[in-house]
Regions:
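Catalytic domains of carbohydrate-active enzymes, especially glycoside hydrolases
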Residues: 1-15
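Conserved beta-strand positions in the central sheet of alpha/beta enzyme cores
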Residues: 11-13, 46, 63, 84, ...
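Glycine-rich, proline-tolerant flexible connector loops at the mouths of alpha/beta enzymes
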Residues: 13-26, 108-116
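Short secondary-structure boundary segments
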Residues: 16, 66, 87-90, 108-109, ...
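Alpha-helix-loop-beta-strand connector modules within alpha/beta enzyme cores
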Residues: 27-49, 74-89, 120-147, 180-189
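Catalytic cores of alpha/beta
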Residues: 45-60, 88-100, 132-135, 139-140, ...
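Glycine-rich, small/polar surface segments that engage phosphate groups of diverse ligands
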Residues: 49-55, 59-75, 82-84
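Glycine-rich phosphate-binding active-site loops on the catalytic face of alpha/beta enzymes
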Residues: 64-74, 105-118, 150-180
């Protein structure tokens, strides 16, 4: 992509897990390759709930789910790094040390197939409810999102979107990414 498009990416979350996911040295090698690209384009690399991998490559941060390493422990392990936390309900929000995280991943907005243990979908109303709890923390919407959803998601209060399936399941991932990036840029102008 031309540099102009890459500026739309605020961060890249490395999420390589599940039965089909790479393991061991193969996973480490892929993470290092992704990190090289991220550094080249000045995009922070966040590792999804793999503390060992995040430490091994000195990632820019880590993203945690509600059942992962505690945010307090993560902040001690990763001082000065970006820490994100998945939050899907008001109860999860109220029971989480939000003041210790840099952003929240809110959702899933829609039912998702990319995560076996996904929580129930919260819909646009759930996204709006989470935004009302705190208008200051950066909020990234997650959960089976596509280009057609971007405008509504941003209007519901999200600051950004996290995508897997909209790109990985696309017939032409490059073209799908281009459409998403161009759409996000058009909305942020």
């Amino acid at each position: 992509f031309p540099n102009r498009r890459l500026r739309t990416f605020r961060l890249f979350q490395f999420r390589e897990k599940g039965e089909q996911g790479l393991k061991g040295s193969d996973k480490l090698l892929l993470a290092k390759q992704v990190q090289h690209l991220c550094h080249r384009y000045q995009v922070p690399l966040i590792i999804n709930d793999d503390v060992e991998l995040a430490c091994a490559i000195d990632a820019d941060g880590i993203h945690l789910g509600q059942g992962d390493l505690s945010v307090v422990e993560a902040r001690q392990l990763f001082p000065g790094k970006i820490i994100g936390l998945s939050v899907g309900t008001e109860e999860e929000y109220l029971n989480s040390p939000i003041e210790l995280v840099d952003y929240i991943g809110s959702g899933p907005v829609f039912p998702t197939l990319s995560k076996d243990d996904a929580s129930p979908a919260i819909g646009m109303n759930g996204l709006k409810q989470l935004r009302r709890l705190n208008s200051d923390i950066p909020m990234v919407a997650i959960g089976w999102l596509s280009a057609k959803d971007c405008k509504d998601i941003l209007q519901a209060g999200a600051d950004g979107i996290a995508l897997i399936s909209a790109i990985s399941h696309a017939e032409d991932p490059y073209e799908a990414t281009k459409i998403l990036v161009d759409g996000m840029q058009a909305m942020s102008v």
